[in-house]
């Protein structure tokens, strides 16, 4: 019989208020995604306050409850403090957390997904290139969850892909060879540079991505291709992308105060949106 109290390594990926003083917390653990409750965590002098912040890598002590397991202790292992001083990196962390929240099954063991998210937060905290880190994260996470886009064989006919002019089809699950370009009339054009970058990021360790020197045009193209692929799986864009795009735009054109105001408006919506749940048919 399972012990009534157990310990697990976890990353805090979502929070919301419950009752007068509790917090509902969604965590990613090596054993999958799980919703737990932190009793009294919103009270001023709660010993849990500050120990269940978003994106914190922590060791939790949980008591098995009737409906939700209860957080009895949290011992942070890494708060990723440097990440929290950069608004664009915070937005990237929100996006990374939202993807696992939407795609990882509840209480379905996936140690690799946990490791990928943890590695991504570490890379963002260490100052790695944000966009390339996220592209590598997307590709590795999709692979771990059974959504790996086909980049070495044609997604339609299975022929080995060459460095010819290929197209990318979210509907068929990856790149199309020239002979199959007409299979999906909505397939996206894909440059050779973007094709090579996607294959490289898919095949290399996550931490390598931050060391690459890639042109802005190729970076933007690969982002667009993977957004289209994820949009097909999730049936809409992740909510956090709108904030990340706003931050990037304002960093180029506005003052830091304007960026801070946008963050306040976005995060005033709360850490969670109960409508942002698992997409139908995504698994």
Curated annotation (Swiss-Prot):
The keyword DNA repair applies. GO terms for biological process: DNA recombination; double-strand break repair. Pfam families: RecO_C, RecO_N. InterPro entries: ARFGAP/RecO (IPR037278), DNA_rep/recomb_RecO_N (IPR022572), NA-bd_OB-fold (IPR012340), RecO (IPR003717), RecO_C (IPR042242). Involved in DNA repair and RecF pathway recombination. Residues 254-264 have a biased composition (Polar residues). Transmembrane segments: none annotated. This is DNA repair protein RecO. Residues 254-283 are annotated as: Disordered. The gene is recO. Keywords: DNA damage, DNA recombination, DNA repair. Gene3D superfamilies: Nucleic acid-binding proteins, Recombination protein O, C-terminal domain. GO terms for cellular component: bacterial nucleoid. It comes from Roseiflexus sp. (strain RS-1). Belongs to the RecO family.
